[in-house]
Design a protein with these regions (language model features):
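Short, polar/acidic, helix-capping and beta-turn segments at strand->helix junctions
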Residues: 2-131
């Protein structure tokens, strides 16, 4: 796997317009871009931060699967939210995905590129290897 670089797309128009990949597999690492709660097929987004968090994680899960990775392989997660007070309501959803994995984590308060976006999640993982 060393030396191989593979680009993963979600089909989002944002990827074409901005010039990035949903994820990049480089060697045995998977780097998933900051992912928002857009449903990329419908290009819609909920106004509810908890629903957005759930959709973010579904979008990330698809990218991880295409990369040959899974939740147990995630080593780092970054959460970016414009409103700090929106983070705690998301904890039950985040715990469902990361509770047993317990990756290194950071939460950052910052503006996002679209005012409808309430949370963005980025992960780094290893390519899954069966032992």
């Amino acid at each position: 796997m060393i030396g191989m670089r593979r680009l993963i797309s979600s089909g989002s128009s944002f990827e074409r317009e901005i010039g990035y990949s949903r994820a990049v597999v480089d060697g045995d690492w998977v780097f998933v871009s900051g992912t928002t709660g857009f449903d990329y097929e419908a290009m819609t987004i909920s106004d509810n931060v908890i629903e957005q968090a759930e959709q973010c994680l579904r979008n990330i899960e698809m990218a991880l699967a295409q990369a040959g990775s899974r939740w147990a392989d995630v080593v780092r997660v970054r959460y970016i939210l414009p409103r700090v007070e929106d983070f705690e309501p998301c904890w039950p959803v985040l715990r469902r995905y990361f509770g047993d994995v317990r990756p290194a984590a950071t939460m950052i308060a910052a503006g996002l590129s679209d005012p409808r976006m309430k949370i963005e999640i980025e992960v780094t993982a290893k390519v899954h290897v069966e032992l």
